[in-house]
Amino acid sequence: MFPDFPARRSLTLAALATAALLASCAKPPPPLPPPPPPSISLSSKLIDQASAYRAYVGRASTISPAFANGQQVSDAVRVGAAYQPDQLLRGAIAYGAVAALQDPAFVAGVRAYVGDATQRQTIAYQIMRDPTYAVGISGSASAAGLVIAALGDNGRKVLDQGRQIKQAAYDIQHSAWSKGEVAGRDARLLQAKQLSTTPGLGEVDDAVRLQQASVGAQPLGLTGAAVPPPYSPLVVRSLAIAALAALGYADDAHLDHAEPLMTDPASTTCLNMSKLNLYQCLAVAKPYYEDVFCLGQHVLEDTGACLMKGAGLVAPPDPIIEAAKARAAEAAATKLVETSTKRPRPRRTKR
């Protein structure tokens, strides 16, 4: 009934067999290219913390010691006391990370690992588990030098301003107003405590500049000589955050992985002690010149010393104190010479 059916069936099978043979001989499609490596990215939250830190340093280091009345003293105390220790520390680490990202050698050393997704993830997780892992990355010494220079300079500015203001506490005592009792003493102590628990804010323009600097679009112009390890915990964590940013693991999506590194117990203790000393000082201070001393010593000089110590630096001796010591030593030496020259000579006894 269908005499050509077997023939057609044979042809179909033959065609299928030929197609299968040709398919087996064809080259397989090329593998999909790997995804492009992630770009350098630092979370906007970390950038904001760095900006808030820089804003406080800028305000504190420009408080004028030329006080003319009690209101100026009260205003200056409010400005100086307005930082939250934990936030200031996180801001210092974040700014240190931006500083480290200014070093081309360190960035290149980290970016050498981003081509392989598995290797990139491994390096990032190593840093998350142990921040000191970042110290072993090529270029870390020059990056650490920038971190130390940037944070050390910030701390030195605040410290030096504090010393000038502390000296003003003695100088203004020639003015009658400085010996008047501070108005609302209890309220100003309470306000200092409230300001110490209120997060600070940075400048929008500065945050934009830091964001651009973190990706190499607008360098900050920092300078600093390479420094070999060991480094302070704060510097190590700045390097670690910078390395995670260069690996693509410090952006907003990975912030939960980066935030645990934003700590330094020693610096936290130092800043908290500065605050405690401020509260105790304000609690007993009565005249305005004593508030000026509290501001200079415990708000600014102590805080600046904490920032320098966090960067692994030692606060330099106070030149005013050193000069006073030198004058005292010179006076003592002069008095000793005068005493020795006036001492009567022993009489000779007759034989």
Locations of regions flagged by a protein language model:
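Bacterial N-terminal signal peptides that target proteins for export
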Residues: 2-13
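Acidic/polar low-complexity scaffolding segments in large eukaryotic proteins
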Residues: 2-3, 25-249, 329-347
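A near-ubiquitous, low-amplitude feature marking generic local secondary-structure context
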Residues: 8, 36-39, 93, 227, ...
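Bacterial N-terminal signal peptides
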Residues: 14-21
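Secreted, short cysteine-rich peptides and small extracellular cysteine-rich domains stabilized by multiple disulfide
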Residues: 254-318
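Short, low-complexity, Pro/Ser/Thr/Gly-rich segments in the mature regions of secreted, periplasmic
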Residues: 305-351
